[in-house]
Regions:
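Short secondary-structure junctions
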Residues: 18, 109-112
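Short, conserved phosphate-binding/catalytic loop or strand-edge motifs used
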Residues: 113-119
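Short beta-strand-to-loop capping motifs
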Residues: 81-83
């Protein structure tokens, strides 16, 4: 799956979209875009230039304000499954099994699963 396809799948279909660049020692830089295509292009360019690039999971009503009272839409539900020593699941395999059972038991649609790699 490419970046544009991913972003179109997880982001709402209206509002302004935000990219945030956070590099060590620098103030975060945010940029607003009217389309997911422009957001994806900017993120890819910023990444190619060696930046740490993030995107906001919500869209916003107006440019310039990435705050809760300016949120237009949020299109995703996030569930954090902690795995590892001292966490609810001993490893990712057990955490994934519990997640899949939860999805089956609740009737939620098939998810997109992302492993952050740090439990």
């Amino acid at each position: 799956m490419n970046s544009l396809t991913f972003l179109k799948r997880v982001l709402p279909d209206k509002g302004f979209y935000v990219s945030i660049i956070i590099n060590e020692g620098d103030a975060p830089q945010q940029a607003f875009f009217p389309t997911v295509e422009e957001l994806a292009n900017y993120c890819l360019m910023a990444d190619k230039n060696g930046n740490n690039v993030y995107y906001a999971v919500s869209s916003f009503n107006t440019k310039g304000k990435r705050k809760q009272d300016n949120v237009c839409l949020t299109n995703t539900l996030f569930l954090d499954v902690d795995c590892g020593d001292g966490k609810p699941y001993a490893n990712q395999k057990k955490g994934l099994a519990a997640l899949l059972k939860f999805i089956q038991d609740t009737g939620l649609p098939a998810p997109m699963i992302v492993s952050s790699g740090r439990g």
